[in-house]
């Protein structure tokens, strides 16, 4: 008897490996189809599936793709539109079982849907609640800073709290970033700080704006956390989001902003030394009049590679994995489910309390530019942040250089010309 096989490729992450294992086993029992799974480092995943166009060669049926890459993937025809398949057999509860913020980024300019949300961020403020509620720590903080120890609302308060909890002699640091130059969190950190101070990446007429006052303050703040205030360990310069999330879970860090999934990691006894001691909240805002609580709306969608030789079976897996039961599996395995039912599930919230805040966080989210050229812009921003964090360039010079490069990309791609015409 011939065994039907699907091939799935995803970013490497323990949560994805665990959830897809359960979901693939479930699908095999349901249909007899074996789902072979491959997990790749994020840069390699982009280089292979998007830049190298492996999505076209028939080597993979299912592709877990981050929304940053979708405009380019859609423009290049690397993913199949799902509209006809959804019309014939919609996912359970489609579309209202998902928040609007979980449905928009996978919809192309043509109005077609190119994937179903599989794993959500968002980025959240994650902190050691046991340290914040310790009476002796509260007394010491109030004596030193003149106001009560609490979850910081502004970035100025964040620095105060980080300074208070930084005790290198005890291997304690007030904060942690994911500053490895992989074009992922190092860029997203800058965007969050830019937006939380009222800044924007570009203007309405497609001129770079991130090098202006809010951007200077944002990038300098990230540099200062490591080099001036010394509240972030220098090892953060070598940590991507996954490594920083696991480092936080080992204890010794008071606060970080990171993907909500790492709040899940911190609550899993097999991975964490601080389970039951972690809470989440809103990311702090800028101290000026433009300050606002902001997070990043970036998520991972499961789509069908355009070269798939079995798109109907691939959709059956996608559809089944999008069900309420399987979406909950994603969350219980250490990822972040995307359905409202998962976010509101009592068992999920008991295991991972941060789900109580996810809907509130989604009220104030922004996304990177939804244009095919964004990956190229992202690389410029990644180099800019790394040049500043590694002290190769002063912040104004790093920003100015990057703004010129982004301007060149936008001009070459016709955005400025189109606006001026």
Model-derived features: where do they sit?
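Long, aromatic- and glycine/proline-rich binding clefts that accommodate carbohydrate-like moieties
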Residues: 276-285, 331-383, 387, 412-421
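A structural signal for short loop-to-beta-strand junctions that line the ligand-binding cleft
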Residues: 51, 58-61, 91-132, 290-294, ...
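Conserved N-terminal structural module of periplasmic/extracytoplasmic solute-binding proteins
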Residues: 1-76, 90-95, 136-140, 289, ...
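Extracytoplasmic/periplasmic substrate-binding proteins
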Residues: 23, 187-192, 196-197, 219-310, ...
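Short helix-initiation/N-cap motifs at beta->coil->alpha
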Residues: 40-48, 153-157, 235-249
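Hinge/lid segment of periplasmic solute-binding proteins
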Residues: 67-124, 186, 279-283, 350
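Periplasmic-binding protein-like
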Residues: 170, 228, 318-340
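Helix-loop-helix "hinge/cap" segment bordering the ligand-binding cleft or interdomain interface
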Residues: 86-87, 107-186, 199-235, 306, ...
